[in-house]
Amino acid sequence: MHITVLVFNGVTSREVVLPLTVICDAVNPTVRWVALQPGPVHGFEPLQRFEAEAGIDTVEPTDLLLVPGGLGSVRMMENPEVVSWVAATAAEARFVMSVSTGSLLLAAAGLLADRDASGHWLASGVLEAAGAHPTEEPVTWQGNVVTTAGAAAAADVAAELPRRIEYGAPG
């Protein structure tokens, strides 16, 4: 199982760590860390840091594209290079999952156009302005795209994703 994680300065660390921990309890995935450019990325929380091995100039097929949220989400959704990378990588992914305000990036990439989507309640206006229909549901599936309201909901989804990816089990 291959997972691609988009990280950026201001990412909420638990939105990365919690779903990945749940997935790693079930399978031993290969995780590819991607950021604007390779190198260190600082999470929102003090002392939390991720090391991106690749920049957004490369797109590779993946089983799961994980797009977490955080204070840097709006800045990322306003970056056309990031939005293009999300759209291109999502097109190559078997599944796409956003956590909290990560849904803003999916909406900006056109993945949530005229679709229901979960996300952080404080960002529902921005999500709607980007063309999605915000819901109050903690999890919203739209085909192979799943949006979650936060880390706890993402952990619930992460518990079933390995089964869906590895065995093609229906949802």
Task: Tell what function each PLM region has.
Residues 96-97, 117:
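A short beta-strand/loop micro-motif in the catalytic core of glycosyltransferases
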Residues 112-139:
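A conserved active-site-flanking secondary-structure segment within enzyme catalytic domains
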Residues 1-96, 105-107, 125-126, 133-136, ...:
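Extended, subdomain-level signal for the structured scaffold at the beginning of enzyme domains
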Residues 144:
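Short FAD-binding loop at a beta-strand-to-alpha-helix junction that anchors the flavin cofactor
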